[in-house]
Amino acid sequence: DIESFTVGEIQVRGEANIINKTQTSLIEVPIEQIKTIPALLGEVDIIKAIQLLPGVQSSEGTSGFYVRGGGPDQNLILLDGVPVYNASHIGGIFSVFNADAVKSVRLTKGGFPARFGGRLSSVLQIDMKEGNSKQFKGDFTVGLVSSKFTLEGPIIKDKTSFIISGRRTYIDLIAAPFVNAASTPGSSTDLILYFYDLNAKINHKISKKNRIFFSAYTGKDKLGI
């Protein structure tokens, strides 16, 4: 006799191996390492640090860089995914990126995905910090040519955070006595030479793998006599 039996459910599961594809043209530069590089007048400059990487050429005294024979305009520079078309202050002496507000720096020198279109040489991705989600923290720095401040903290603890960071140079204040001393007796010359940057970001964690953020940047150069 043939009898049938009902058995419990049998589940067969398999897991695919995660293959990590190494992209040889991608270089990630730790921001803490960038801060240890000697800088002009003590002003940490991310673009100047990029110019020191292998496969990258630069011109003396400018913040532009050349990759694979292309000009500076063939480098796509992104700040939190948004293109930055003018990445320098005062004619290229300093870059517009405040290192105190930056979380990560990645340079892709070739073979970058199609979503980074419109450029031939490289893609420079700069991501801002997300802010401290546990406690408030503030920093204030006085340098040779500029002062900087950073304020970050939670809006909703462990959920929503913010960061505000800014800097302003005071080259005009330092140089004013020397300019007036060199001017014609009986006349005064007002030197206007400074720039400022302001970065702000609000980050909200939706889940462990998802988040939404709003980031903003503004800056200005002022030059006049």
Task: Briefly describe each language-model feature range.
Residues 1-2, 46-49, 65, 92-98, ...:
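N-terminal periplasmic accessory domains that precede
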Residues 73-75, 101, 134-138, 158-162, ...:
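Outer-envelope beta-barrel architecture signal
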Residues 38-86, 103:
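Extracytoplasmic beta-strand/coil segments of soluble accessory domains associated
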Residues 143-168, 184-222:
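Transmembrane beta-barrel wall of Gram-negative outer-membrane proteins
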Residues 17-19, 72, 84, 129, ...:
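Structural signature of outer-membrane beta-barrel domains
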Residues 36-38, 82-109:
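Short acidic/polar hinge/loop motifs at secondary-structure boundaries
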